[in-house]
């Protein structure tokens, strides 16, 4: 692309668009039957930090009949330059226009990237609306955590992959390949062919009806042979670690090597979508992790490695693993990161064991400011445990800690919000009696967003006015104590709640907001709530209907036809437990909670 060479010197971070990175895979286009572009709807340095996309990239490229290439959302200046030069959106590996691919697969991990999906399709010269595509257009598919409520994006995506993609994506590519050879063409026929694969959901094959109050009445298949429920795919064993990941030319958000030590979490925090949709827990062995570390560090040159999971300190042999790592890499100046830790002294001891030299900062998430509210969300930490944990961290040499809280959790009162301030003050008072100048405590607050497939999916989000009032309580209280507070813009949390719990009506609002200029909504400097407010008004949509309305346990939810494997009965039971402040124990270490997965997955631990 000669035109590309002409515009790259004029845009920010041109290395976002050059490709050719170490460990990138360039296959012979003509020697493969199926070509997929793996698309991430945000900039390069964020998408390159996504482990899931890296796993799929390498799995597909191991297949001799298929190739996978990468594409990310160009930044605003690059989009403008591409449109001016009539350069269509292209893949990094071959620089081919996306229109040349058989399939474009989007990873949807955050609702505020939805308008970027539309921008990427438009830049590629592909009709944004699935209803306007024909046989000459690539198949547009999407997966990721947001696909567990696919309805708001149903007008734009031909096919959703529900659940974990490692197996189902290869099945889909094989099925697509067979169709091309045996049938040839016919978009509807192709989709009907692919819809037979478990975990595949084609929104155009379902009729959604609504009640007079705009709630969903039903979602039913249009054709025989189409399943009434789309079931989440789960893999029994984690696929091998990617030990030759693509090495970016520029710094990325998580610029380090990564190994997923385990997948899934059963601690049962009632607000947590990931804790439901990534169940059950599946672990790698210590031997597998250590062997992969050797290869990964050798193939990348990184001197920092993250051991990733939803709760790293719950890995069954975490002490043995850390001991083995310390023994094996002693003196190698290797930094180990444990990004998801329980708030207890054991986690501090783990960090102490892997941290050599200067200690920087620890991060924990108490989530709520009172013991009562933590019981409601099933995060059963006492104030005493939190204070003792931070005191232990201070004694072990840490001078800085960041604490994450949510405001607007179900049943939260002003007293609970003030409890965040009191808890922070108690921490500071307890620690200031120790050495030196005390512990630097940073508080981060964000508004609770009710998510699909969680016990709190029926709960309404508090209003933006209430969010601002509660942030003000924190600002005033923490300022007096000399502690720093950061918070998420309430309007961003509000829009996230709208899109999280939306139905098909929202597709027209997403489309209209995009036409009005909405893009990079996840970026604070680009987020324009007024654009969205106008889109909702023009489309006669009340955002409060989705974000703030409390829903009946009997209501048909827009995502009810998506089966995560966790039963609605279990979610209702957990919702009722929250109102009673009743704890539900982690089924890995106690009795089975009969969430539904015990009937489906061999890795579930069943202790009845």
Label each region the model flagged.
Residues 76-77, 152, 207-211, 316-317, ...:
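Flexible glycine/acidic-rich beta-alpha junction loops that bind and position SAM and/or redox cofactors
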Residues 1-26, 30-32, 36-38, 480-608:
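Radical SAM enzyme core and accessory elements
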Residues 50, 251-287, 591-608:
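Canonical Radical SAM [4Fe-4S] cluster-binding loop centered on the CxxxCxxC motif
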Residues 73-221, 455-503, 511-524:
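Glycine-rich beta-alpha loop elements in corrinoid/cobalamin-binding modules
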Residues 36-42, 60, 246-273, 297, ...:
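N-terminal pre-triad scaffold of radical SAM enzymes
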Residues 38-39, 43, 112, 295-402, ...:
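Conserved SAM/AdoMet-binding glycine-rich loop
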Residues 7-37, 44-45, 203, 209-258, ...:
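N-terminal [4Fe-4S]-dependent radical SAM core
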Residues 53, 85, 121, 155-160, ...:
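Short secondary-structure boundary/capping segments
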């Amino acid at each position: 692309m000669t035109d590309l060479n002409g515009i790259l010197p004029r845009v920010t971070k041109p290395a976002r668009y050059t490709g050719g990175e170490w460990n990138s895979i360039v296959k012979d286009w003509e020697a493969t039957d199926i070509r997929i572009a793996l698309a991430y709807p945000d900039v390069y340095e964020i998408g390159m930090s996504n482990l899931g996309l890296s796993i799929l990239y390498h799995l597909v490229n191991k297949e001799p009949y298929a190739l996978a290439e990468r594409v990310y959302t160009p930044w605003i200046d690059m989009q403008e330059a591409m449109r001016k030069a009539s350069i269509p959106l292209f893949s990094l590996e071959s620089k081919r226009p996306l229109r040349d691919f058989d399939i474009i697969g989007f990873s949807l991990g955050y609702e505020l990237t939805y308008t970027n999906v539309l921008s990427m399709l438009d830049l590629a010269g592909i009709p944004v609306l699935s209803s306007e595509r024909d046989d000459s257009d690539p198949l547009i598919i999407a997966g990721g955590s947001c696909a567990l409520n696919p309805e708001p994006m149903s007008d734009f995506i031909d096919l959703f992959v529900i659940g974990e993609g490692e197996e189902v994506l290869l099945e889909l590519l094989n099925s697509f390949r067979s169709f091309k050879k045996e049938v040839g063409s016919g978009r509807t026929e192709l989709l009907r062919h692919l819809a037979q694969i478990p975990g595949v959901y084609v929104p155009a094959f379902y009729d959604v009806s609504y009640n007079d109050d705009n709630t969903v009445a039903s979602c039913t298949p249009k054709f025989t042979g189409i399943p009434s429920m789309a079931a989440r795919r789960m893999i029994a064993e984690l696929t091998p670690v990617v030990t030759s990941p693509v090495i970016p030319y520029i710094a990325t958000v998580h610029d380090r090597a990564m190994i997923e030590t385990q997948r899934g979490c059963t601690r049962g925090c009632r607000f947590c979508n990931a804790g439901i949709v990534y169940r059950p827990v599946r672990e790698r062995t210590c031997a597998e992790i250590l062997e992969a570390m050797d290869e990964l560090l050798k193939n990348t040159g990184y001197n920092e490695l993250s051991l990733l999971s939803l709760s790293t300190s719950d890995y069954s042999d975490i002490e043995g693993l850390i001991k083995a790592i310390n023994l094996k890499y002693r003196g190698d100046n290797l930094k180990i990161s444990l990004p998801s830790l329980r708030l207890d002294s054991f986690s501090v001891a783990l960090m102490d064991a892997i941290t050599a030299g200067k200690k920087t900062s620890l991060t924990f998430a108490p989530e709520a400011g009172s013991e009562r509210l933590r019981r409601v969300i099933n995060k059963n930490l006492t104030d005493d445990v939190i204070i003792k944990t931070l005191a232990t961290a201070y004694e072990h040499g840490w001078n800085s800690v960041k604490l994450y809280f949510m405001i607007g959790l179900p049943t939260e009162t002003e007293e609970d919000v003030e409890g965040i301030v009191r808890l922070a003050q108690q921490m500071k008072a307890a620690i200031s009696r120790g050495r030196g100048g005390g512990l630097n405590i940073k508080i981060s607050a964000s508004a609770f967003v009710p998510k699909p497939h969680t016990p709190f999916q029926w709960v309404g989000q508090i209003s933006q006015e209430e969010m601002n009032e509660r942030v003000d309580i924190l600002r005033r209280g923490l300022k007096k104590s000399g502690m720093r507070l950061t918070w998420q813009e309430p309007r961003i949390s509000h829009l996230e709640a709208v899109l999280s719990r939306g139905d098909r009506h929202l597709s027209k609002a997403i489309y209209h907001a995009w036409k009005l200029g909405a893009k990079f909504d996840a970026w604070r400097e680009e987020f324009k709530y007024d654009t969205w407010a106008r889109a909702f008004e023009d489309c006669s949509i009340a955002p409060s209907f989705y974000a703030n309305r409390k829903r009946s346990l009997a209501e048909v939810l827009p995502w009810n036809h998506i089966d995560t494997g966790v039963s609605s009965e279990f979610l209702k039971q957990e919702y009722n437990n929250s109102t009673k402040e009743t704890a539900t124990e982690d089924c890995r270490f106690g009795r089975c909670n009969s969430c539904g997965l015990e009937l489906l997955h061999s890795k579930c631990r069943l202790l009845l």
